[in-house]
């Protein structure tokens, strides 16, 4: 994904928390080694993306847009929207999309700038691949791990990576904090 132009300032980023204007889009690498901007995916800080190869669909998380959108790559139309604060990364596994969301404000994140381990709440949300409707939500208070950035389900566990700590964590898919 192309989140924003290289000359995008911190002031513009903070303004976009409220304005939610288009800052970037998903980019496709073609067979001719060229990049094609998918303008129909334009949104506020497109971040995590995942390709559902079986259905030829693309999921794009809009970090400051507070939503994830499922696009049909053939028709270039939206098939579903999941609205939730600050989606980060997305994984497709087991016939579902797994979207990690930051369940805290940008102001709370800014207070973590100097700390090694920033403990703020987040969730990993299991979504339908047909329309991004919520199937199940796993919520974490992040007491000792750091802010979750990605959740990968595997063998009854949810493996969680963090963007503001030096840890990964394993959570039981049958329990939530």
Residue ranges and their predicted role:
Residues 29-33, 72-76, 128-132, 174-175:
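Short loop/turn segments that connect beta-strands within beta-propeller blades
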Residues 147-177:
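Blade-level signature of beta-propeller repeat domains, shared across WD40, Kelch, NHL, RCC1
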Residues 52, 84-142:
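Loop/turn-rich, solvent-exposed surfaces of beta-rich toroidal or solenoidal domains
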Residues 20-25, 35-57, 65-66, 81-96, ...:
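Beta-rich, blade/repeat-based domains predominating
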């Amino acid at each position: 994904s192309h989140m924003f132009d290289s000359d995008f300032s911190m002031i513009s980023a903070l303004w976009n928390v409220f304005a939610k204007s288009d800052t970037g889009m998903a980019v496709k690498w073609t067979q001719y080694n060229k990049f094609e901007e998918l303008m129909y995916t334009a949104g506020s800080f497109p971040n995590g993306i995942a390709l559902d190869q079986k259905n030829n669909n693309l999921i794009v998380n809009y970090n400051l847009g507070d939503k994830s959108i499922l696009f049909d790559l053939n028709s270039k139309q939206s098939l579903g929207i999941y609205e939730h604060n600050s989606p980060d990364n997305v994984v497709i596994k087991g016939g579902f999309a797994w979207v990690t969301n930051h369940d805290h404000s940008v102001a709370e994140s800014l207070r973590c700038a100097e700390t090694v381990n920033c403990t703020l709440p987040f969730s990993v949300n299991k979504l339908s691949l047909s329309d991004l409707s919520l199937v199940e939500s796993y919520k974490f208070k992040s007491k000792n791990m750091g802010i979750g950035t990605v959740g990968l389900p595997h063998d009854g566990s949810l493996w969680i990576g963090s963007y503001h700590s030096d840890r990964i964590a394993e959570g039981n898919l049958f329990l939530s904090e």
